[in-house]
Amino acid sequence: MMVTVVSNYCQLSQTQLSQTFAEKFTVTEELLQSLKKTALSGDEESIELLHNIALGYDEFGKKAEDILYHIVRNPTNDTLSIIKLIKNACLKLYNLAHTATKHPLKSHDSDNLLFKKLFSPSKLMAIIGEDIPLISEKQSLSKVLLNDKNNELSDGTNFWDKNRQLTTDEIACYLKKIAANAKNTQVNYPTDFYLPNSNSTYLEVALNDNIKSDPSWPKEVQLFPINTGGHWILVSLQKIVNEKNNTQQIKCIIFNSLRALGHEKENSLKRIINSFNSFNCDPTRETPNNKNITDHLTEPEIIFLHADLQQYLSQSCGAFVCMAAQEVIEQMESNSDSAPYTLLKNYADRFKKYSAEEQYEIDFQHRLENRNCYLDKYGDANINHYYRNLEIKNSHPKNRASSKRVS
């Protein structure tokens, strides 16, 4: 394969830049693996070609991006110099795109830019921002990477901060992945506590909507990640059916990684669960099949589990919600008779026994996994969008990359 070296990329105009990447060659799985092997041996041309392929929005673009990201995220003594080359190539692309286009970093401009992955959530962006020295530029990149549609981020948010709060989107991506094949547990989309400009809550709306559409709901353990206002909790809801005496009981566990939640929030949650239970108990309520409810529901069991886990991890409530939910999901799949309270209590007790250093490491490793899930979401969405566009154009997918170097 012939490689053309072009220097002084940052001096190119938009037209010259497009022409530089005009020559194409077909990408295959064999080529990717060959480039990975030579890149790991320190070949700079292979590293830069992987970057050029990674700019693509097809499946090979994502695979090339994954190769580079995996090398950076899993450093060894043998790969430290390789990682430096990868980061340098990423920074060259970043500077190239911004200098050539004369645009500030704004995600809504990305459709008009040559290197879209450098202006949207991507693993290339994650690599780029890690070593950028200017805090203000890191914060600008963070706004794009975290795709802040819910306006959750403060101006000082740093995507690479090891102790920042996880966003709704990050939590949702992780929980969706771990619950994908769960049969005994269902995870609901993370929400705020109150509806905008209202005293009503997202939880009571969700409970009422579900029971109206299916009177036997919930059949599985329901998990609700809820942001109470700068703090995430996990609500577990389960209906226990006793067929012998024809009774049902609602069991609700509120898992809180702090030592307290506050009387207002606790009273609101009690009211919501009691109201939901009363609706279930209403003997005049009819099902969609016009059958009256005959099962008797006893008083609901509501337990607040204040785990007090954040002594060393002040901003990790979202991470604890994800890890606690994962504990429930995995254990319920291996034993459907497990009680969510027991699982959550055991998880909290086990975590407290770790040293401060061990807790930091567990939190750090979870955040890395969470970040991978989040960035993969956008990578997969890019692939789907790419192939949808090809179908619309009645064209077969052609996986191509530039034969030009980034240097």
From Swiss-Prot:
Q: Does the keyword Protease apply?
A: yes
User: What InterPro entries is this protein classified in?
Assistant: ElaD/SseL-like_N, Papain-like_cys_pep_sf, Peptidase_C48_C
Q: Which residues form the active site?
A: H231, C317
| Enzyme class label | hydrolase
Q: Does the keyword Kinase apply?
A: no
Q: Which SUPFAM superfamilies match?
A: Cysteine proteinases (SSF54001)
Instruction: Output the GO biological process annotations, alphabetical, semicolon-separated.
Output: proteolysis
Any idea of its EC number? 3.4.22.-
This protein's UniProt keywords: Hydrolase, Protease, Thiol protease
Q: Which GO terms describe its molecular function?
A: cysteine-type peptidase activity
Q: Which is an annotated Pfam family here?
A: ElaD_SseL-like_N
Give the family this protein belongs to, as stated in its UniProt record. Answer: Belongs to the peptidase C79 family.
> Main role?
Protease that can act as an efficient and specific deubiquitinating enzyme in vitro. Does not possess desumoylating and deneddylating activities. The physiological substrate is unknown.
What is the name of the protein in this document? Protease ElaD
Give the organism the record lists. Answer: Escherichia coli O157:H7
Identify the coding gene: elaD
